[in-house]
Amino acid sequence: MKSFDEMTPKEIVQELDKYIVGQYEAKKAVAIAVRNRIRRQKLPEEWRKEVLPKNILMIGPTGVGKTEIARRLAQLSGSPFLKVEATRFTEVGYVGKNVDSMIRDLVEISVNMVKQEKIKEVERQAEELVEERILDALVPESKAVPVVTNPFINLITGGQQQQYTPEDRRRFRAKREEMREKLRKGELENEEIEIELEETVSPFMGIFGPGMEDLGIEITNMFSGMLPKQKKKRKMKVSEARKVLLPLEAEKLIDMDKVVQEALDRAQNRGIIFIDEIDKIAGKESAVGPDVSRQGVQRDLLPIVEGTTIMTKYGPVRTDYILFIAAGAFHVSRPSDLIPELQGRFPIRVELSPLTEEDFVRILKEPENAIIKQYQALLSTEGVELVFTEDGIREMARIAYQLNQRLENIGARRLYTVAEKVLEEISFEAPDIPEKRVVVDAEYVRRRLEKIVQDEDLSAYIL
């Protein structure tokens, strides 16, 4: 398979098609946007500074694939990705989260992403070090028989020095190799050992009120290097010790300065921030009440989207080349209700169409992570073969679409509630049913949902 940087916009859309049904225009827009970033990397330095990403505004009802398109794109490109709700933020001066925190969160995600990649590279070495530490606990050297040599040396060293004969050392090595063999064969997984772990005392957490969590984390990180690291002995099984020690040993092998440098570069040049519910901060604000800082949030958001420098605990981060994708249903407000400067920062606008009954049929069947495939995989662990007929799938799609028309339109999310209700009985009885092949047809779907769908009040609560 091609690396992401070699993929054409058409190929990116084809990859997104594996997970998201329809919405071609939105897929096309994001594919062009990320491809332009790759093109920008190939430009000479003077041109690279001039080319800024074209941010995208997605307009469409809930459950049509806005978030999923952005999330899958980030996974595909290996970009640091952060999803935030615009309603989470408040204007500077009000209690709540400032918009700057989204950049700090993105950098944190980027650092963790690069760190995990580097840990994977040194995993083999780390496993060898973990094996040695477990063997140290299983066969401590102190258990070898000491030989008293010079009493004057013992007097000076407080009796702590132990001398071993060559025979003792040979016996110790043989015992250690014997235990190594058993360890590699998995014979000692349930053996209990005592290992020493470092713990940093954190006296600052928990003293900061709501909206000040960031400050608490920053102060804790600032003092973490100065705080004493306490060593604590813990008893655990070998299998558990391996899980605990592996990340600790791997971290010792990686250069954190290089990790941070690469993570900052990745966040600045490849980062994607998805701002959901942007329509909720659009419109005229009131002088009092919960909407008092709507326009203030937009004004605070403006410099970040335009391009500014935000200080993080890892260093300054420029936001000029971060791709921002904003999304909203815009049922009550319109994109023109956003402040003009912010509108200008989202030049690419795509409208996602509401899902039809036929789209629902495709969503149930086609994506690689399709709902019915998920249930088939889950129940196969109990030895149950779940078979969906074409008319059964169409009946589920029809009922979900009908409920969306009658009740609140929640898009494809309605399919999850319908599928869950249809398969509730099978999921409950799966381990005990004698007939391990279950066929879900239209009749079966109607039988499971008939009463609920007919009762308006009941369907409003259950589906």
Curated annotation (Swiss-Prot):
GO terms for molecular function: ATP binding; ATP hydrolysis activity; peptidase activity; proteasome-activating activity. A double ring-shaped homohexamer of HslV is capped on each side by a ring-shaped HslU homohexamer. The assembly of the HslU/HslV complex is dependent on binding of ATP. This is ATP-dependent protease ATPase subunit HslU. Transmembrane segments: none annotated. It comes from Thermotoga petrophila (strain ATCC BAA-488 / DSM 13995 / JCM 10881 / RKU-1). The keyword Iron-sulfur does not apply. Pfam families: AAA (PF00004), AAA_2 (PF07724). Keywords: ATP-binding, Chaperone, Cytoplasm, Nucleotide-binding, Stress response. ATP binds at V21, G63, V64, G65, K66, T67, E68, D276, E341, R413. Belongs to the ClpX chaperone family. HslU subfamily. The gene is hslU. It is found in: Cytoplasm. The keyword Cytoplasm applies. It comes from the Bacteria. ATPase subunit of a proteasome-like degradation complex; this subunit has chaperone activity. The binding of ATP and its subsequent hydrolysis by HslU are essential for unfolding of protein substrates subsequently hydrolyzed by HslV. HslU recognizes the N-terminal part of its protein substrates and unfolds these before they are guided to HslV for hydrolysis. GO terms for cellular component: HslUV protease complex. GO terms for biological process: protein unfolding; proteolysis involved in protein catabolic process. Signal peptide: none annotated.
